[in-house]
Amino acid sequence: MQYEFKDMLINGTEFNKGSSREVLQYAIGGMLYMPATRTKIVQDVIEQKNPDMKSICLDLEDSIGDDTVEEALILLKSTLSKLYTAMEEDKLSVDNLPLIFIRVRNPEQLRTLKNTLSQEQLGIITGFNFPKFDSSNTAEYIRAFNELQHKSLTKLYFNPILVDVNNYVEREMD
């Protein structure tokens, strides 16, 4: 069944991370980026501090310094584990969980996440944002994502963030 964006807006289509791709492509909406080092993410989600917040991105790239990457990875794992526990303890339902994306720095960091995140932690995530995405790194991002998807028990998605849209479109049109 195809959903049209207009119908979703008018009818207020319900969705969660398990919804179809046709729904999720529109449901992401305005994504709230926050550093993965932020310590109140779990509390804010459980308490529904921002009930209209439908998607968030835990940022491992621009919002954190190079010297805090390891700390951010540790906090990211903790955040995902706490959200999983909250769902197991019925403090949070999949319908109240925002769509959670992780913005990685590069394909290698995606592989690091594949090797360090548990299946439970991966189950909380909806997908990943790939920054500075262009023809020079497309294949590597896709390979790393496919490796991670193979480990996950749930469907994951990715959002490429294009470096230079005009240049990319012109190249693809030729």
List PLM regions with ranges:
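Conserved alpha/beta-domain cores
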Residues: 2-18, 22-174
